[in-house]
């Protein structure tokens, strides 16, 4: 425990909280351009080919973002909206692409959880 004199001399430093999505620079989403669309394999107990895209954001960062849902239309030079949110079994993937906005179309034939995949209500 510091003495009162020590606290007067050197005030306590506030604990700085570190953001989990630094590339967004405090914004809820950021626009970016795909530079590469490819698949990667997940960490140990899981096995799949997860779809990801390398995205150059308007903030100047180059990030890896996950493409959620079954099937997508993204390719190089596609303009996408990126939100925070990591993928637990993909190391280094800390962002998600928002489906149903800009060049990323919604998931085809999606019935449940439609709002997360940019799908309008079926007639």
From Swiss-Prot:
PROSITE patterns registered for this protein in UniProt: RIBOSOMAL_S12 (PS00055)
The superkingdom listed in its UniProt entry is Eukaryota
Single Gene Ontology BP term? translation
Q: Which UniProt keywords apply?
A: Chloroplast, Plastid, Ribonucleoprotein, Ribosomal protein, RNA-binding, rRNA-binding
CDD domains for this protein: Ribosomal_S12
- Record-linked Pfam families: Ribosom_S12_S23 (PF00164)
The subcellular location is: Plastid, Chloroplast
GO CC annotations? chloroplast; small ribosomal subunit
An example Gene Ontology molecular-function term: rRNA binding
Spell out the subunit comment. Answer: Part of the 30S ribosomal subunit.
The UniProt entry's sequence similarity note says: Belongs to the universal ribosomal protein uS12 family.
Function field: With S4 and S5 plays an important role in translational accuracy. Located at the interface of the 30S and 50S subunits.
List the protein's name.
Small ribosomal subunit protein uS12cz/uS12cy
Q: In the UniProt record, what gene is named as encoding this protein? A: rps12-A
């Amino acid at each position: 425990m510091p003495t009162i004199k020590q606290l007067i001399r050197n005030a306590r430093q506030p604990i700085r909280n570190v953001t989990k999505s630094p590339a967004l620079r405090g914004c809820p989403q950021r626009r970016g351009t795909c530079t590469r669309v490819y698949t990667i394999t997940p960490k140990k107990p899981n096995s799949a080919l997860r779809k990801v895209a390398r995205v150059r954001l308007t903030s100047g960062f180059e990030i890896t973002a996950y493409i959620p849902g079954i099937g997508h239309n993204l390719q190089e030079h596609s303009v996408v909206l990126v939100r925070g949110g990591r993928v637990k079994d993909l190391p280094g993937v800390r962002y998600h692409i928002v489906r149903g906005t800009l060049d990323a179309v919604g998931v085809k034939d999606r019935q449940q959880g439609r709002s997360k995949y940019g799908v309008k209500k079926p007639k």
